[in-house]
Amino acid sequence: MSRGGSFGGGQSSLGYLFGSDNEIPKTPAPPVAPKPAPPYGVDSTEEDHEADQKPKISNNNYQRVQGQNSGNFVTDRPTTKVKSVPGGGSSLGYLFGDK
């Protein structure tokens, strides 16, 4: 058997990767007809609903003297504002015991 010769098994089936001299012409798919509209009408679109809906207003977004992100705005927790300087007193006394 010479180098580069076929050793049986027929021709390679990798023609789809590297191109083939024996390409089979493909028939184009038939065009898809558009779907006809139903005789009873169509549903309304989102544009119609936008005008009907009232704007949503948050009932807990009101003016505060300290600013909007203070107090129990969303989480019903006290403010997280830093109250001591770096290296100063710790607010973790309840964990480690006040000294």
UniProtKB/Swiss-Prot annotation:
Could you say which tissues express the protein in this record? Expressed exclusively in stems and flowers.
Annotated GO CC locations: microtubule
Give the compositionally biased regions (Pro residues).
27-39
Q: Enumerate the residue ranges of region (Disordered).
A: 1-99
Keywords of the record, alphabetical order, are: Microtubule, Phosphoprotein
Compositional bias per record (Polar residues), positions renumbered to this chain: 56-73
Gene Ontology BP terms: cortical microtubule organization
Q: List where Gly residues composition bias occurs.
A: 1-12
Please list the residues that carry the modification Phosphoserine. Answer: 58
Q: Which family does it belong to?
A: Belongs to the SPIRAL1 family.
Task: Please describe what this protein does.
Answer: Acts redundantly with SPR1 in maintaining the cortical microtubules organization essential for anisotropic cell growth.
Q: What is this protein called?
A: Protein SPIRAL1-like 5
Q: State the species of origin.
A: Arabidopsis thaliana (Mouse-ear cress)
Gene that encodes the chain: SP1L5
